[in-house]
Amino acid sequence: MKELVKEKVLKALKELYNTQVENFKVEKPKEEAHGDLASNVAFLLARELKKPPVNIAQELADFLSKDETFKSVEAVKGFINFRFSEDFLKEEFKKFLLSGEAYFKEDLGKGLKVQLEYVSANPTGPLHLGHGRGAVVGDTLARLFKFFNYDVTREYYINDAGRQVYLLGISIYYRYLEKCPERDEETFKEIKEIFEKDGYRGEYVKEIAERLRKLVGESLCKPEEANLKEVREKILKEESIELYYTKKYEPKDVVDLLSNYGLDLMMKEIREDLSLMDISFDVWFSERSLYDSGEVERLINLLKEKGYVYEKDGALWLKTSLFGDDKDRVVKRSDGTYTYFASDIAYHYNKFKRGFEKVINVWGADHHGYIPRVKAALKMLEIPEDWLEILLVQMVKLFREGKEVKMSKRAGTFVTLRELLDEVGKDAVRFIFLTKRSDTPLDFDVEKAKEKSSENPVYYVQYAHARISGIFREFKERYKKDVSVEELINYVQHLEEEAEIKLIKKVLFFKDELVDITLKREPHLLTYYLIDLAGDFHHYYNHHRILGMEENVMFSRLALVKGIKEVVRLGLNLMGVSAPERM
């Protein structure tokens, strides 16, 4: 609808002033009383035309008022307010009914090669609620991009290198050694010291240790006596799942073996959790592969050649402060190991070399301070500034019976994403995670998510779809036939009531909503729109009989609710939420 008004305005500019202006706005006014859409175009022409905006707005309004698309075009304080005519709205609604979701599609992306990287949780523990929220934000954006013809790649970056993976191995070994009847106390003391300072304390670590014990018995209680090769072969032979890391990487010691084994089990669980949410990835990219292929080393050498790397205190530093970071950053420690930042730059450079024209990272809000150094490194590599976009996702607080559930990852006391999915279901999790801007904290009320009432937003929206499906089922039972869209469009002109015109408008504006949501990267606005539409529908349904009315009224109302049903279905589908036929 906005594009249509823009086209009409551009045509008027050509006819009246033989000029064009591209960057004017056509937006929904804050108050309905000001019309369906409003434009600021007159203000942008004032200098060129040497006229006050008020005069230009009036001339344009007078010209555009003759167009039958509009019921009225008014100039108000230099702005132009547009109201669509009912005849135009009804004709558009017919087009929509015949086209279905194709009516809302547009070649917005023009095949632009976009990479969306999201979740990318450390594979050292189960997914928590914050990861789940990031997953839903990323996946919904990916669905919207696909809908608007972007060439989308959904990618998960596996942080399978570095200290956190070593600490997973330490934590598993500590829990394993704890239960050894006879063990090497010196080893246990060393492992315990590291564990108590930095280890992972969740119950899942104990479960992995027990699973390991069932496979290898007590053979790792005394590491100096353990035959690492035999133990590894036993794990590979006895374990019921495919073990990628355990199989691919020859372990240096027991901790290394258990790190790989732990990685395999955690990645399996992460994939399963995401699958339960109907989230899949095109690429699972391993951080370790950047070291295996020599990409990290080559990248640091490239930055050296460009003069951005220097040595200090035995370490290699990157001059990120030259490009907006608050200080320079270490890329290689004095012990010869690379920092996470080094592999991260290599990963982004890898994305660039793969030909992505736009890269969007969905990160946890705790990464906020990390953004300037990444942007600085990309500037050094002469990658355009707008190539990388970073969306931040804030944490989720869980509430039960009005009280916050206290969680601590450090202490290993947290509700996992899997536990929440088991309790309230995928649809409630996905929908509620999108009910607020991603960069603001979200409160998740477990009781409300399970309610079958208007207080539960996902139920409220899904019920609109199910209710309309029920109307058509009842029609078939009563009249012993189905009704086609081709039949229904003949009755659209009989929709006369203010509430009906309002609903038609709401449906037709869905495309503008989707375009805005996609371009602004604000998928939460999809839930706002659907809750609003469902509310208008439920109100209409409660005050208007549909079946059993005289022919023109019944079929026109069936046409109206058919259109609403299609929009609710599409909106839910773009969020990965089901649209049930019955509830």
From Swiss-Prot:
<comment type="similarity">
    <text>Belongs to the class-I aminoacyl-tRNA synthetase family.</text>
</comment>
<keyword id="KW-0547">Nucleotide-binding</keyword>
<dbReference type="GO" id="GO:0005737">
    <property type="term" value="C:cytoplasm"/>
</dbReference>
<dbReference type="GO" id="GO:0005524">
    <property type="term" value="F:ATP binding"/>
</dbReference>
<dbReference type="InterPro" id="IPR005148">
    <property type="entry name" value="Arg-tRNA-synth_N"/>
</dbReference>
<dbReference type="Pfam" id="PF00750">
    <property type="entry name" value="tRNA-synt_1d"/>
</dbReference>
<dbReference type="InterPro" id="IPR008909">
    <property type="entry name" value="DALR_anticod-bd"/>
</dbReference>
<dbReference type="InterPro" id="IPR035684">
    <property type="entry name" value="ArgRS_core"/>
</dbReference>
<dbReference type="InterPro" id="IPR036695">
    <property type="entry name" value="Arg-tRNA-synth_N_sf"/>
</dbReference>
<keyword id="KW-0963">Cytoplasm</keyword>
<dbReference type="Pfam" id="PF05746">
    <property type="entry name" value="DALR_1"/>
</dbReference>
<keyword id="KW-0436">Ligase</keyword>
<keyword id="KW-0648">Protein biosynthesis</keyword>
<keyword id="KW-0030">Aminoacyl-tRNA synthetase</keyword>
<dbReference type="InterPro" id="IPR014729">
    <property type="entry name" value="Rossmann-like_a/b/a_fold"/>
</dbReference>
<dbReference type="GO" id="GO:0006420">
    <property type="term" value="P:arginyl-tRNA aminoacylation"/>
</dbReference>
<dbReference type="GO" id="GO:0004814">
    <property type="term" value="F:arginine-tRNA ligase activity"/>
</dbReference>
<protein>
    <recommendedName>
        <fullName>Arginine--tRNA ligase</fullName>
        <ecNumber>6.1.1.19</ecNumber>
    </recommendedName>
</protein>
<dbReference type="InterPro" id="IPR001278">
    <property type="entry name" value="Arg-tRNA-ligase"/>
</dbReference>
<dbReference type="InterPro" id="IPR001412">
    <property type="entry name" value="aa-tRNA-synth_I_CS"/>
</dbReference>
<comment type="subunit">
    <text>Monomer.</text>
</comment>
<feature type="short sequence motif" description="'HIGH' region">
    <location>
        <begin position="121"/>
        <end position="131"/>
    </location>
</feature>
<dbReference type="InterPro" id="IPR009080">
    <property type="entry name" value="tRNAsynth_Ia_anticodon-bd"/>
</dbReference>
<dbReference type="Pfam" id="PF03485">
    <property type="entry name" value="Arg_tRNA_synt_N"/>
</dbReference>
<keyword id="KW-0067">ATP-binding</keyword>
